[in-house]
Design a protein with these regions (language model features):
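A domain-level signal for the structural core that forms small-molecule/cofactor-binding pockets
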Residues: 2-62
Length: 62
């Protein structure tokens, strides 16, 4: 039972997440042979003030 965890900055729409989940599921199925119905995709929406890159919070960028 493959589990794919996706962490993203908050702000994606439900449609965007649905499209990502479908593509990820297809890719995992294609390369692992796991049945689509057992492939799980989870999304973690991270607020800009809770994610940093290079020591700088995303809330401090643009």
């Amino acid at each position: 039972m493959p589990i794919v965890q996706v962490s993203l900055l908050a702000g994606r729409t439900e449609e965007q997440k649905k499209a990502m989940a479908e593509e990820i599921t297809e890719t995992v199925n294609k390369h692992s042979g796991a049945p689509k119905e057992v492939i799980t995709v989870t999304f973690s929406d991270i607020e800009r003030d809770s994610w940093a890159a290079g020591g700088i919070l995303y809330s401090e960028k643009n």
